[in-house]
Structures are given as C-alpha cells and as structure tokens.
Amino acid sequence: MRLWSIHPAYLDPAGLTACWREGLLARKVLLNQTTGYRNHPQLARFHCTDPSAAIDTYLHGICDEAHRRGYRFDRNKLGTDDPALQITVTDGQLAYELEHLRHKLLRRSPETALLLPGAEPDGETGTTERCDPGPEKQITIRPHPLFSVTSGPVEPWEKIT
C-alpha cells in the first residue's frame, strides 16, 4: 500500500489509479470495514482526530487530479471533503517519495520520469537521471493538498527500501 504524500499530478496513469484503489482500501481499514492492514505503516498519519475526514480529504485530492485528466473516479464512494484539514509531512519524506516514484517510472514510464522535478535526460542513453541542482538551487516538490510541509527527515513510519 502506498499513499503518496507528493502531489498526485506527479503520478502516471498507473500510479494514480493504484493510489485511488489503495486509498479506498485504506478508507475501509480506517473505518473498521475490513480486518486486514490495520497496522500498515502508511496509515499512521491518518490516525488523527478524525481519520474518516482525513482519508476522505486525501481521496478527494486524488479524485480532483483524476477529473483534471478526464478520468472518472467515483466520488460517491467518499464522505465529505474538508479543505481546512491539514496533516504535516516533512520535506525529507517528499524527497524520498519523489525518488521512489522516479525509480518506478524509469521502469514503466520513462517519459513521465522526465517530467519530475530535478530530472535531467541523459543525451547518450535517453535515460533519466536525477539532477543535483547544487546548494544554490532548491527543488520544490509539491505535496498532496492534504499535507503541509515542515522541515525534517523521512517520516518514521516510512519503510525505506
């Protein structure tokens, strides 16, 4: 299960669809409608004051991106969106997720990997490598609309692979 903290605009079609499906599964877990995945680390950040509102707001963000692309994700499966709700995520987590996504995209959708922040095509091989912008230029990684960014390392709930 991967519930991306980065903005869904970075995801390719397969990634966006997988995020939607895994988000719906996460919703069932958080609403106690299934017995599996209860201790999944990706769900830790959604165990806040109102887990239902948090996951529904997350999924509405995924739905918004899908709608922007012309996909038809069924918003009727969700509860109410709470645009005022914010969960913090560290910039280290966003950077980790962007690199994790980059590695996935290099295998299944190299042309999409070129669109990620900090990507630079290799002129000889046509592959995409991470571009080190140096200390004078910081790469901005947009978070999913549910998340507000704070400075810090990769989140403790992340299983680093």
Predicted regions and their residues:
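Short beta-strand
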Residues: 35-37
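Conserved, mostly hydrophobic/aromatic
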Residues: 40
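Sequence termini and other peripheral, non-core segments
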Residues: 1-16, 22-33, 47-161
